[in-house]
Amino acid sequence: MIKVGILGPVGSGKTSLIEFLAKEYSERGIKVGILTNDVVSAYDAMRIYHNLVERLRILPRENVLGLVTGGCPHTAIREDPSLNLRALETLEERANPDLVFIESGGDNVMSTFSSSLADFTIFVLDTSAGDKYPGKGGIGITESDLLVVNKIDLAPYVQADLNKMREDSLRVRRGKPSVFISLKTGEGTRELIRILDEELGLERVFGNKGQ
């Protein structure tokens, strides 16, 4: 079971990214599980359940699990991931997924996952938050395995310089991959999938399903 942690600020598009990736990999025959973290409600889990289980019928109901963690979002994924680790055991027992996406509650650029919880981490930024963010750094941006800059279709409306964001991402991440996408228009999503396939070794692990 490969565990992919997805984190980033509130509203950056983490849940939408998970829905896109779950659909993409489920259609290849890879069994996908989803574990969400919310501070005060299971809103994201309910949204994913409605979209992927009830409406599109991509996932069985037992493949989606939501946690209400309370307190600081990063505590449950870094300092004390025990609640998430138990939830992963439950998810594995009832769904036996090949690939699990774990969504953190919305947090800041210093958020990271415990290595005991996630094998690979994706940090999601929102273009409309401003082109300064990649250059500001923070361990979420600099140390994640993949940086996803989402909502690039909004760049002209918020006067965000995508070239500056690309240059800053390359500089602060010291060569680790970044990808610029719009989940709304689909721009950049094929490159995102290519990077994930390669970084996660999906073809090696799952054979033809990983292609």
Swiss-Prot record:
Keyword tags: Chaperone, Cytoplasm, GTP-binding, Nickel insertion, Nucleotide-binding
Binding-site positions, GTP: 8-15
GO terms for MF: GTP binding; GTPase activity; nickel cation binding
Subcellular location: Cytoplasm
Pfam family, one: cobW
GO cellular component, one term: cytoplasm
HAMAP family: UreG (MF_01389)
Family: Belongs to the SIMIBI class G3E GTPase family. UreG subfamily.
Complexes and interactors: Homodimer. UreD, UreF and UreG form a complex that acts as a GTP-hydrolysis-dependent molecular chaperone, activating the urease apoprotein by helping to assemble the nickel containing metallocenter of UreC. The UreE protein probably delivers the nickel.
NCBIfam families associated with the record: ureG
Annotated function: Facilitates the functional incorporation of the urease nickel metallocenter. This process requires GTP hydrolysis, probably effectuated by UreG.
Protein name: Urease accessory protein UreG
Organism of provenance: Metallosphaera sedula (strain ATCC 51363 / DSM 5348 / JCM 9185 / NBRC 15509 / TH2)
